[in-house]
C-alpha cells in the first residue's frame, strides 16, 4: 500500500482500472481509500473497476499471520477481491480462491537460491508456478456456481436414489390411509416423499399390496 496522496490522485485520474494491495491497512482505511478513488471518478465521469488485494506486508508471511479469512470481510466492500501472497509455497494462494479471491499475485523467481535477497525464498520457481496455475484452475472448477442445484451427473441416478410412497403392509379396498400405512422405498418413480398430505385421510379405491405404490388415481 502506497499512502502518497498525490500519487493516488494521479492514478485515479488516469481513468484506468486500479488494483490495490492492502498491506498494513485495516478495513476502515480500505473503505476510505476506495471512497477517495470513487469520489474522483464520480467528479470526472469515470466508470472503471477497482480490485483490492488482501496482503500481509511480511516477507515471508508466516502461516499464522496470513489471515486468509480477511478476504471474506473485504468482499463486503462490493469490489473484486484478490490475494497478494507472500507465504512460502502455494497452498495459501490456492486456498484464497476458495475464500473468494479472483486475482492472485505471487512473486516469481528462476531459482529460489538465486541470491540472498528475501524475495527469492518466498517466490515460486517455474515448476511451482506451473503447479499454482493448475491448482488454482482446479480450485475454480471445484467451487462451481455456488447454487445448490442437481448436477448433470446426478440426474442420471435421481430416480433411482429418491423414494416413493408405498404401502407399509397389505391395505384393503376402502382403507382410510394413516401414517402407519405408509413406507418410503426406492426408486422415486411414484408419488415422491414429502407429499404425504396428498394421501393421508384418503380412502383407497382398490387393494394395495405391501411395497406397492400408492397413487393418486387409487384414492377416493
Identify the function of each model-found stretch:
Residues 1-220:
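Catalytic cores and adjacent flexible loops of soluble metabolic enzymes
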Amino acid at each position: 500500500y502506497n499512502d502518497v496522496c498525490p500519487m493516488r490522485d494521479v492514478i485515479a485520474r488516469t481513468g484506468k482500472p486500479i488494483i490495490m494491495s492492502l498491506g498494513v491497512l485495516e478495513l476502515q482505511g480500505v473503505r476510505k481509500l476506495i471512497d477517495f478513488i470513487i469520489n474522483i471518478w464520480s467528479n470526472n465521469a469515470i466508470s472503471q473497476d477497482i480490485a483490492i488485494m488482501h496482503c500481509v506486508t511480511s516477507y515471508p508471511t508466516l502461516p499464522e499471520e496470513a489471515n486468509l479469512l480477511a478476504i471474506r470481510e473485504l468482499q463486503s466492500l462490493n469490489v473484486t477481491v484478490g490475494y497478494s501472497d507472500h507465504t512460502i509455497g502455494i497452498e495459501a494462494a490456492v486456498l484464497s480462491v476458495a475464500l473468494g479471491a479472483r486475482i492472485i499475485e505471487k512473486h516469481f523467481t528462476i531459482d529460489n537460491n538465486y541470491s540472498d535477497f528475501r524475495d527469492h525464498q518466498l517466490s515460486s520457481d517455474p515448476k511451482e508456478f506451473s503447479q499454482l496455475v493448475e491448482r488454482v484452475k482446479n480450485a475454480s472448477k471445484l467451487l462451481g456456481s455456488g447454487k445448490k442445484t442437481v448436477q448433470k451427473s446426478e440426474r442420471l441416478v435421481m430416480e433411482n436414489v429418491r423414494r416413493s410412497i408405498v404401502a407399509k403392509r397389505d391395505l384393503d379396498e376402502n382403507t382410510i390411509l394413516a401414517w402407519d400405512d405408509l413406507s418410503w422405498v426406492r426408486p422415486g418413480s411414484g408419488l415422491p416423499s414429502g407429499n404425504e398430505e396428498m394421501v393421508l385421510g384418503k380412502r383407497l379405491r382398490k387393494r394395495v399390496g405391501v411395497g406397492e405404490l400408492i397413487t393418486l388415481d387409487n384414492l377416493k
